[in-house]
Structures are given as structure tokens and as C-alpha cells.
């Protein structure tokens, strides 16, 4: 069992958006120094796009700075094998309206046996991981 927490775009939005209803909880979660984190380039891309299009370039730059400052963060690249696994996840959960990024994340969560996901998206619990 992997003790790392998988970070989804929702947790980045919550921690950096003071008006977000989960902001205080997200700040508390990131205050847990003992937690190793995992996310993917797909999640980072999705998060950067969200901040850029909703709050502008400076907000997207702030996200990039926040992510760069996370010591102990593992960022997963994307391979053709990851793409194939993502397609299998999309087929497996057909009807759940999963985005490609969420399906890729579910694939990595299962592959790496990650039991904890920091997210605001219930879809990332489809494989049994706990959503915080």
C-alpha cells in the first residue's frame, strides 16, 4: 500500500482560492508535512488551464509556483501505456461521465496502489480510494 496522496486539480483550486468552500480544509491538508504527494502532468495542465481561463495569467503563475514549492511531490509523465490504461478505465466506467484526466488519474491510483486522494471530485473514489 502506497501512503502517498494523489493530488487532483480540485485540491489545487481549493488551496489557492480563498473563496472556495474547501479552502480551509485544503490548507490544513497541505500543512501535513509527513505526506508524500503524487500528481500527473495531465492534472497540472488541467489546473493551469482552469486558473488561466477563470482568473488570468497571474493566477496560473501562482499555481505553478505553489506546485514547484511542494517538496516530496512526484509528478507522473504520460506514456503510450498510460494512454492505453486510460482508455481501459474509460471503458470500464462507461456511463460515469469521466473526463480523460480523471480516468488517467484512476489508472495511476490503481497502478500505484494509492489509497488516499485529495480531490473535490467524487469520481476519483470509483476504485475504492478515500477522498479527502
Name these PLM-found stretches.
Residues 1-39, 51-66:
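Short, well-structured N-terminal submotif of metal-dependent ribonuclease cores
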Residues 4, 103-132:
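Acidic, metal-binding active-site segment of PIN/NYN-like and related structure-specific nucleases
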Residues 10, 42, 104-107:
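Active-site phosphate/pyrophosphate-handling residues
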Residues 12, 44, 124-125:
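A generic structural signal for short hydrophobic patches within well-formed alpha-helices
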Residues 31, 65-71, 91, 110, ...:
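Alpha-helix boundary recognition
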Residues 36, 72-74, 130:
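Conserved beta-strand segments of alpha/beta enzyme cores
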Residues 73-117:
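Active-site neighborhoods of divalent-metal-dependent phosphate/nucleic-acid chemistry enzymes
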Amino acid at each position: 500500500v502506497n501512503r502517498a496522496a494523489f493530488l487532483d486539480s480540485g485540491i489545487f483550486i481549493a488551496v489557492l482560492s480563498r473563496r472556495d468552500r474547501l479552502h480551509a480544509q485544503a490548507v490544513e491538508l497541505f500543512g501535513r508535512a509527513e505526506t508524500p504527494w503524487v500528481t500527473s502532468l495531465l492534472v497540472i495542465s488541467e489546473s493551469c488551464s482552469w486558473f488561466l481561463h477563470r482568473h488570468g495569467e497571474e493566477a496560473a503563475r501562482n499555481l505553478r509556483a505553489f506546485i514547484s514549492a511542494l517538496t516530496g511531490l512526484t509528478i507522473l509523465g504520460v506514456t503510450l501505456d498510460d494512454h492505453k490504461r486510460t482508455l481501459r478505465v474509460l471503458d470500464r466506467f462507461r456511463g460515469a461521465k469521466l473526463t480523460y484526466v480523471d480516468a488517467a488519474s484512476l489508472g495511476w491510483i490503481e497502478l500505484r496502489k494509492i489509497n488516499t486522494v485529495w480531490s473535490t471530485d467524487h469520481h476519483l473514489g470509483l476504485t475504492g480510494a478515500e477522498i479527502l
